[in-house]
Structures are given as C-alpha cells and as structure tokens.
Amino acid sequence: MAVRVVVGTQWGDEGKGKYIDMLAEQSDIIVRFSGGNNAGHTIVANGVKYALHLIPSGILHTDKTCIIGNGVVVDPAVLLQEMKGLNERGVTTDHLLISDRAHLVMPYHKELDVLQEKFRGSDSIGTTKRGIGPCYVDKIERSGIRMCDLIDENEFIRKVKANLKLKNLIIERVYGGEPFEAEPIIKEYLGYAEQLKKYITDTTCILADAVDEGKNILFEGAQANFLDVDFGTYPYVTSSNPIAGGVCTGSGLGPVYVDEVYGVLKAYTSRVGAGPFPTEQNNEIGDTIRELGLEYGTTTGRPRRCGWLDTVMIKYTAKINSLTALAINHVDTIGKLKEIKLCVGYKKDGQIIRTFPASLNELAKCEPVYEVFEPWNEDISNVKLFSDLPQNAQKYLNRIEELVGVKIGLIGVGKDREQIIKVF
C-alpha cells in the first residue's frame, strides 16, 4: 500500500495535474480534498487538453475510483457541466464518488462574493467570485448545506429557507443587492440532487476500507501552500487548507497513513491576482516568461504575474508539508531566457534572511538575493534521463535541491504527461 499526496509549493498553477495523472496510473483511488471550482487543473493526454476544476484529474483513468472529499465545496451546476463535458469527449464519470459531508456552493454565496469584493474596493482580495469563501464561512459558522442535505428533500428545503432569512438581510441592507426567492433555488437544486444522488456516499468509510485492503491512494492537491488560509500570504489566500495537512481534515484519512508528499513547482514563479510577490518581474522578463510558459489562468483566463524562482518560499513549503520529493515543471521554458536568476535569500534591514515572514509589511521590506545561471537553449522535450540534460540545466536543478533540502524526483520538460524525467 502507498498513500501519496501532491501539493503545490507556490501560488498554484504549478502543473500539478500532469504529475497527478502520472501517479494516478499507480493508484487505485484518487481524492480531491480541498477547495472548489476556484482552482483548475489542465492535463494534456494524447494531444487532447482537459481543464478540470472539481473532478479529480484521475478521472481519465476509468479503472480508478475518483473521490471529491468532504473538504471540497461543490457547485453542483459546475460539477454537472464538467461531467457532461467529459462524457461528450468519451470519458465516463461512473467511477466518481462525492462525499456526503462536502458542502454546497449556493447562489447566495456567489452573490455575496461579488458584493463583498465590490464593497472592498481597492482592498479587494481578488477572489474568483465563485462563492467559495462565503461557502466556507457558512461551513465554519455551522449554517452550511451539505451533500447529505441535498438528497434529503425536506431537510434541504428547511435549510434553504432558514439561510435566506439572514442572507437576504445582509444582501439587501448591507450591500444594497437584490434578495433571493427560495422556490427557484429549491427547484434548481433538487434537480441537481436527482442527477447526483447516485454519486453521493460516505467516502470516509470507503477510504478506511481501502487502507485496510492495502490499496494505493493518491491525494490531489488544488491551489498551493502560499494560498493556504493559515500558511499563505494572508489575506491574499484561499479559504481552505490545500497543504498536505488538509488531506486528513478534507478526507477523513488519518495522518499516519501518508507515505509520500510531492511538492510541485515551476522553474520560475507565477501568481494570479493581488498579493505580495518578492521575485516578480513586472517588466520585459516577466512578459517573456508569461508568453513562453503560456501563463494564463485555467479557471479565469487572467494573465499571471511572473518572476524568478524563490527558494525561500519552496524551503518554507517543504517544512510545512513534510515534502519527500520535488516535482519541477517548465525546465524547458526557463532555459530559453538570456539568463536565469534564482532567489537564494532575502535582504532585510541589511541582514540576509532565509525564512518567509508572516507579516506582509515585513515581507515588503525584503529584497531578493539572486544567483545567476546560464541558460541552456536546447530542445529537451524528449530527454528521459537527468544525466542527458544540458549541464547548465543540471547545475540549476542541483542548486535548487541544495537550497531547499529536498531531492527532485520528477522533472517536467514539456506539456504532455509523457514529457517527464523520473529521477526516482
């Protein structure tokens, strides 16, 4: 039995889907454990591009069980649309299961998300306005509606009506918005219930049984460490815990069963939306990285901010997640630049530091300290062995390992899931 976890080490969009898809081949069960459809994975298989937002990337493997865990918040309309899109392309979703403890994103969550961002003005967080944050708020304040409620008609109706009493007051009196009527929501969501009920079950018990049976389980992280509500660049974060620790709370599996944790990173850094970014290159270099790496959001289509790889961040992530291996993408992309810089520390108040500050005010005082590397400018898309990489690429990767303190196990040299060097 092997229980593996794949997490992002930066601000998301690191290319986790490709490695998840590869590791899924060795797994019996693939689990999504946090976030909602504010995250996105892109997989390229046999030249076909699949963009997934809720369904685990392992769905392409029809002999595997795919689970949406209790830590995920589910917009049923989005989920059903995603299922339909897969079905239309010949991919079955019959092997998908949804935790009966997962919370539902409701129409008023999405409306509140929009109204709150508008209200914040210049202090807006930069949410995707998909209702994820307000849904997690309801979960924590114990007024959320779960999948088990969706398939219990009387309970669902009761909860919707009870919630709207307060939600409509907030929408109308605080934000000046239009109130919701209960009946249209009830009718819409009971329609979703009819379509989804066969997928909804107690997935915690299924995972416990799988462990007892010695099955291989893969936990698919969405987003990344620096979007974590506790360990990210707060408040420019998501509303959940997409770190390895979130596996346990987002699925019900105990921590002693986790064997391996892969941390996925790019050979540079990117992020979408507002928030600090110490190594950002708001210049021609950043523009070049964006174009070479096709850095546009899977979910939003927004251009991503781009900059140099920051090993202070990656080392911090390695500690938080107990990483056992790194998986690095875009080694082919970064090698095309005229020169490559690697952040090895920060200079703050005249001192060199190698830790990541919690305070954004303190982080703003940090100036990246760089080492410069020569590019390789070679086509490495078909390289299968680390030793066959250009010497300049090997030097860059070896230095990353040295600074982070974790070995690189997987190296992405192209978009396709087959374009991976397996170091160990």
From Swiss-Prot:
<feature type="binding site">
    <location>
        <position position="40"/>
    </location>
    <ligand>
        <name>Mg(2+)</name>
    </ligand>
</feature>
<dbReference type="InterPro" id="IPR033128">
    <property type="entry name" value="Adenylosuccin_syn_Lys_AS"/>
</dbReference>
<feature type="binding site" description="in other chain">
    <location>
        <begin position="13"/>
        <end position="16"/>
    </location>
    <ligand>
        <name>IMP</name>
    </ligand>
</feature>
<dbReference type="InterPro" id="IPR027417">
    <property type="entry name" value="P-loop_NTPase"/>
</dbReference>
<feature type="binding site">
    <location>
        <position position="142"/>
    </location>
    <ligand>
        <name>IMP</name>
    </ligand>
</feature>
<dbReference type="InterPro" id="IPR042111">
    <property type="entry name" value="Adenylosuccinate_synth_dom3"/>
</dbReference>
<feature type="binding site">
    <location>
        <begin position="40"/>
        <end position="42"/>
    </location>
    <ligand>
        <name>GTP</name>
    </ligand>
</feature>
<dbReference type="Pfam" id="PF00709">
    <property type="entry name" value="Adenylsucc_synt"/>
</dbReference>
<dbReference type="InterPro" id="IPR001114">
    <property type="entry name" value="Adenylosuccinate_synthetase"/>
</dbReference>
<comment type="similarity">
    <text>Belongs to the adenylosuccinate synthetase family.</text>
</comment>
<feature type="binding site" description="in other chain">
    <location>
        <position position="128"/>
    </location>
    <ligand>
        <name>IMP</name>
    </ligand>
</feature>
<comment type="function">
    <text>Plays an important role in the de novo pathway of purine nucleotide biosynthesis. Catalyzes the first committed step in the biosynthesis of AMP from IMP.</text>
</comment>
<feature type="binding site">
    <location>
        <begin position="12"/>
        <end position="18"/>
    </location>
    <ligand>
        <name>GTP</name>
    </ligand>
</feature>
<feature type="binding site">
    <location>
        <begin position="412"/>
        <end position="414"/>
    </location>
    <ligand>
        <name>GTP</name>
    </ligand>
</feature>
<dbReference type="GO" id="GO:0046040">
    <property type="term" value="P:IMP metabolic process"/>
</dbReference>
<feature type="binding site" description="in other chain">
    <location>
        <begin position="38"/>
        <end position="41"/>
    </location>
    <ligand>
        <name>IMP</name>
    </ligand>
</feature>
<keyword id="KW-0658">Purine biosynthesis</keyword>
<dbReference type="GO" id="GO:0000287">
    <property type="term" value="F:magnesium ion binding"/>
</dbReference>
<dbReference type="GO" id="GO:0044208">
    <property type="term" value="P:'de novo' AMP biosynthetic process"/>
</dbReference>
<feature type="binding site" description="in other chain">
    <location>
        <position position="223"/>
    </location>
    <ligand>
        <name>IMP</name>
    </ligand>
</feature>
<dbReference type="InterPro" id="IPR018220">
    <property type="entry name" value="Adenylosuccin_syn_GTP-bd"/>
</dbReference>
<dbReference type="GO" id="GO:0005525">
    <property type="term" value="F:GTP binding"/>
</dbReference>
<dbReference type="GO" id="GO:0005737">
    <property type="term" value="C:cytoplasm"/>
</dbReference>
<dbReference type="InterPro" id="IPR042110">
    <property type="entry name" value="Adenylosuccinate_synth_dom2"/>
</dbReference>
<dbReference type="GO" id="GO:0004019">
    <property type="term" value="F:adenylosuccinate synthase activity"/>
</dbReference>
<comment type="subunit">
    <text>Homodimer.</text>
</comment>
<keyword id="KW-0479">Metal-binding</keyword>
<keyword id="KW-0547">Nucleotide-binding</keyword>
<comment type="pathway">
    <text>Purine metabolism; AMP biosynthesis via de novo pathway; AMP from IMP: step 1/2.</text>
</comment>
<feature type="active site" description="Proton donor">
    <location>
        <position position="41"/>
    </location>
</feature>
<feature type="binding site">
    <location>
        <begin position="298"/>
        <end position="304"/>
    </location>
    <ligand>
        <name>substrate</name>
    </ligand>
</feature>
<keyword id="KW-0342">GTP-binding</keyword>
<keyword id="KW-0436">Ligase</keyword>
<dbReference type="InterPro" id="IPR042109">
    <property type="entry name" value="Adenylosuccinate_synth_dom1"/>
</dbReference>
<feature type="binding site">
    <location>
        <position position="304"/>
    </location>
    <ligand>
        <name>GTP</name>
    </ligand>
</feature>
<feature type="active site" description="Proton acceptor">
    <location>
        <position position="13"/>
    </location>
</feature>
<keyword id="KW-0963">Cytoplasm</keyword>
<protein>
    <recommendedName>
        <fullName>Adenylosuccinate synthetase</fullName>
        <ecNumber>6.3.4.4</ecNumber>
    </recommendedName>
</protein>
<feature type="binding site">
    <location>
        <begin position="330"/>
        <end position="332"/>
    </location>
    <ligand>
        <name>GTP</name>
    </ligand>
</feature>
<feature type="binding site" description="in other chain">
    <location>
        <position position="238"/>
    </location>
    <ligand>
        <name>IMP</name>
    </ligand>
</feature>
<keyword id="KW-0460">Magnesium</keyword>
<feature type="binding site" description="in other chain">
    <location>
        <position position="302"/>
    </location>
    <ligand>
        <name>IMP</name>
    </ligand>
</feature>
